[in-house]
Amino acid sequence: MPAPTIYVDADACPVKAEVEKVAERLGVVVTYVSNGGLRPSRDPMIRNVVVSKGADAADDWIVENAKSNDVVVTADIPLAARAVALGAHVLGPTGRPFTPETIGMAVAMRDLKQHLRETGESKGYNASFAPQDRSRFLGELDRILRRALKSATPG
């Protein structure tokens, strides 16, 4: 199995610096996928992919390129579900892992919240990103990447 790549749904991702920190320490390639606005990096281990402005263009690109054992970082639940189906390790920016066991409930909760917003039952409040989210993300990404690297090592 080849070494994992980290694919980041980069539009509005609050943990890019944390992704780079862990990836650099473990020697893993990072691919940021966005509709635009990415800063170029001099680091040869970081790739930027700019896709068209379509609603799911970045999501589609990630799903078309990610493979089993790669890592996908996203807050987008439908993308997380598609990546889990590929066999990728999926992590939200708050450090929440999405797995085959947890993705169904995440999709159901997303759909319920969307329905409540559409019917006016909810104002669409999302909790703000907190320092403990950043810390949890760092620890979880390190754990997931080490497991993916171990799976990629023959023997």
Swiss-Prot record:
InterPro entries for this protein: UPF0178 (IPR003791)
Annotated TM spans: none
Record family assignment: Belongs to the UPF0178 family.
Official protein name in the record: UPF0178 protein mlr0875
Species annotation: Mesorhizobium japonicum (strain LMG 29417 / CECT 9101 / MAFF 303099)
